[in-house]
């Protein structure tokens, strides 16, 4: 499937995306009501956004502690190009690793890890260390994510808020 060009998204598409990022369970009728379209027109736009891979999925946000995953850590891995594919394969097969970022800088990969206990975190970290040096940080508190900012020329010119 081919992704829509940014220019192909009009203001109504952008409004729909903003609404669905905040609440992916909104019905087509409710989306239509909020953006001034009929239910069929809103649903057709949502289907087009899905078909063109602008909307790539929907998911429930689950509290890890409710599943007994009380240890949350960020693990950074510095590896070699030769080991990169193996490290990524390990991450994809390890259920405690919930997200992986390939980054620039000294580290190559950053993993979000959720474990039931410190002993399991130690096992995951030791296994990752086979691919290179690791640095582990325990997460004290995670704050809610935000919807993606609108990628428009005006958004790229917005000033970064200054601290109080």
Question: What are the roles of these predicted feature ranges?
Answer:
Residues 1-164:
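A compositional/biophysical signature of low hydrophobicity enriched in polar/charged and small residues
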């Amino acid at each position: 499937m081919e992704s829509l060009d940014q220019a192909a998204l009009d203001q109504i598409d952008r409004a729909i995306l903003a609404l669905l990022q905040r609440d992916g369970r909104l019905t087509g009728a409710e989306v239509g009501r909020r953006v001034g379209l009929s239910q069929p027109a809103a649903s057709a736009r949502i289907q087009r956004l899905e078909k063109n891979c602008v909307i790539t999925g929907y998911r429930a946000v689950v509290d890890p502690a409710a599943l007994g995953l009380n240890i949350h850590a960020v693990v950074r891995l510095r590896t070699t190009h030769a080991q990169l594919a193996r490290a990524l394969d390990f991450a994809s097969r390890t259920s405690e690793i919930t997200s992986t970022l390939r980054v620039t800088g000294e580290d190559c990969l950053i993993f979000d890890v959720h474990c039931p206990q410190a002993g399991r975190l130690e096992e995951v970290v030791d296994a990752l260390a086979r691919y290179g040096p690791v640095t582990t940080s325990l997460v004290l508190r995670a704050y809610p994510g935000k919807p993606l900012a609108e990628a428009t020329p005006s958004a790229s010119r917005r000033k970064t808020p200054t601290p109080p």
